[in-house]
Amino acid sequence: FTSVGKTIFVSRVNKAAIKHQMTLIETNLKDNYSVILFPEGTSSDGLSVLPFKSSLLGVIEKENMKDYSFQPITLSYNKLDGIPIDLKYRPFLAWFGAMDLLSHAWKFLGLGRCEVDLNFHKPIKFREFKDRKTASDHAFKLISGQILRNNNTKKVNKIVKLNEFKIL
């Protein structure tokens, strides 16, 4: 299964593996594959964006990689069965902490039809960034800002308050 998607497994424990993982990213880019990184380093409760880990963006600093592009993408869950999701219900959608993936996925699928927003931000050539930390900060600001706009809870709370519904 992972060979179909060309999955690159990232070790968050073994810092010595970062160089090898960067080489895999570089090789895949040179072979014209897109690489998607989830830079938070772990998952959150969906209420905020965690600080980004910039180490795997180190390919940006390599001179032979300057013509490649970097495109931040925001992924957010905003509606359940067509109804905007109130802030306090977001943790039911997120997989985080010590949650068992299978039982969480089963509960998630039982919630109803969930709408996912994907926002593709402007691609930028690697050469536009001073270093990996600058690229990471740029992506963090774009993504966290978009999450706030997508999760506009003041607007959501005016539309409907899910906690006011009672089961008959």
Predicted regions and their residues:
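Membrane-interfacial amphipathic helices and adjacent loop/beta segments
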Residues: 1-27, 120
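Short helix-loop-beta-strand segments that form the rim/entrance of peptidase-like active sites
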Residues: 7, 33-34
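A cross-family acyltransferase "interaction/gating" segment
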Residues: 14, 33, 45-130, 134
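Glycine-rich phosphate-binding loop signature in dinucleotide/nucleotide-binding domains
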Residues: 28-32
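Cytosolic-facing loops and C-terminal tails of multi-pass membrane proteins
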Residues: 133, 138-168
